[in-house]
């Protein structure tokens, strides 16, 4: 499983400009250098045609150049005074094995209420796995079915965006409870430092219908392109078995490239949601535009920014 924009790792949603952004910056530097050389050459030519008295008079009359005003620096999130949490609990009974891992980043550990929430989730999942494993040992312990008695679970949270008020997190988990293969999935939440409470990413928007109306067409177009690329084809994708899933079936994550507000939205279709298990998951990044901000709840609009 690819760790969770957006799964368990901090997602870099990328940029719509891609490599062109760097190219534009390079062209700007070349133009600036050329402009500077032309100004220098012009100054030398003027100096050569002027007398020393004229040069001194012009220099004395020239007003001092005002220093260009610098834009204010964006606010910074609170400093982190905590350590990343990495918890494991493994056991073995003969050839039967049980493995469990759960972790969250230092930014989450620094918020007591959030750390308590994640700790409770970890303890609940561990207790469930232990009970399931013990039951499997009793039922299949004397059989040759190793897959029937092996259990594996991992869930890792990571930072998607860390803004002064909001900490956006994603998670990815993998679970094996017997059979041919395990299963993976993703999810996320946003922690509101002012309210000291969790907010579901969907909770920032006015309604599921509004999200579908605005994000749905962009998601389906990007998904079709991603499926064609993954399957190595150029023609249309057969959607008879796996039609484009609605936004309601996806993981929604809020990200920030500019660090001043949520300016991009990550959409993840877990395995089986938009394609076969072999296809894996699909991730799409939607830059925040004016029509997206229009469907954000009034109390959260200030937390969003247009993508640049």
Regions from the PLM with identified roles:
Residues 14, 33, 37, 85-87, ...:
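Extended hydrophobic/Leu-rich segments
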